[in-house]
């Protein structure tokens, strides 16, 4: 997740006294407004709990009123502080930090704690209505959905809630996975748009975990609905013969066999992103990026209209970063949710091991850069858990030992999706046009691009990074 404090506001408290509010943005969207004193209080709590050596530097208190230049300097320092805390594996996942952000989000949006009904969507478009509190965090809502569907406790960790934006043409854009520091009801309500919805989707990448999910009736139905949906939207490539086999299995109600066949298809389990821009293999190339199978897959359109395909393995990414910058927009095109006439430009850049001794930066300019980063991080996390002999099931067992999950008695069946539509003939043409990228002959990132706007820098080292030999290339 990308934290930034791009702006400040002078506001008045209940006594009429003015103060400076620092607007904390997550992924380019306002999450909360906080005062310096609130962040100082958080810092003191963290310092008391974890010690001075662990906690990053915090901007000192000033005796006199700050000048505008000093306010801006403090804004930058607080931004770096929030980014440092969030990126620390201990501090960033601490309940102290996350509860502070949840409370600040609720106070900023001025939403009182009360019982409400929240709609969660399944991949097949089915709505699940859950009764929650406005102050319920993401995990609480996920558990409420699982309870409504009668999904067993041990399978809850295989799924996550995602914020998506529906398009007029029926497609959807995955904005982000909902995090532990936010309140889902507040997050979606604060967007003030019916285009956004929360979707339940599997949260893992390794297809071996499918077997655990398919052993349960509800888990099988959820995975089946997601697979059908991914095929319908063209995320999974299917030729005519494969489509005929899938349709036959669907008509027989053979859901497990349907999924088993789908697992053999290209891009099964991938998340596809909206068309965006990359500097690889050439600057300004249009690209469609997919995340799955521990890689980022590129479908690149070169300046000569030629289509090429290539993949970047997460184990060869030494590190990556997300940067944000404010970009002025023309009159009438500014984002209505923003008070300033600026859009946030997001970039994901990763340093990739192209050959044994050659690292190269590759940059993607996309409003979904954060979601791409989340995908990379979850792939790395999954690889590290597997490397240490762990699994999702073992993690859930530990969680249940620490505290049992509460469930209601209400249940709701997961409906089967409709029969597959006929395959889009244009999808096969894309496969025929694409050829493999040659990493040896392609140019990399220019120095001007790699510098970027580091004021909103979100840097990630990769613990799953592996060296390679020439025989791997």
From Swiss-Prot:
InterPro entries from the UniProt entry: PH-like_dom_sf, PX_dom, PX_dom_sf, RA_dom, SNX17-31_FERM_F1, SNX17-31_FERM_F2, SNX17/31_FERM, SNX17_FERM-like_dom
Organism superkingdom: Eukaryota
A Pfam cross-reference name: SNX17-31_F2_FERM
Region (Disordered): 391-431
Region (FERM-like): 114-433
Predominant localisation class: cytoplasm
The keyword Secreted appears for this protein: no
Comp. bias regions, Polar residues: 403-414
Residue ranges of domain Ras-associating in the record: 114-205
PROSITE patterns given in the database record: PX (PS50195), RA (PS50200)
SUPFAM superfamilies: PX domain
Residues noted as binding a 1,2-diacyl-sn-glycero-3-phospho-(1D-myo-inositol-3-phosphate) in the record, renumbered to the chain: 35, 37, 61, 74
Keywords: Cytoplasm, Cytoplasmic vesicle, Endosome, Lipid-binding, Membrane, Protein transport, Transport
Gene3D superfamilies: 1.20.80.60, Phosphatidylinositol 3-kinase Catalytic Subunit, Chain A, domain 1, Phox-like domain, Pleckstrin-homology domain (PH domain)/Phosphotyrosine-binding domain (PTB)
PX domain location: 1-108
Topology term for the membrane: Peripheral membrane protein
Protein's cellular compartments: Cytoplasm; Early endosome; Cytoplasmic vesicle membrane
Region (PTB-like F3 module): 269-433
Protein family per UniProt: Belongs to the sorting nexin family.
SUBUNIT field: Monomer. Interacts with CCDC22, CCDC93, DSCR3 and VPS35L; the interaction with DSCR3 is direct and associates SNX17 with the retriever and CCC complexes.
UniProt comment concerning the protein's domains: The PX domain mediates specific binding to phosphatidylinositol 3-phosphate (PtdIns(P3)). Required for association with endosomes.
Protein name, as recorded: Sorting nexin-17
Species this protein is from: Danio rerio (Zebrafish)
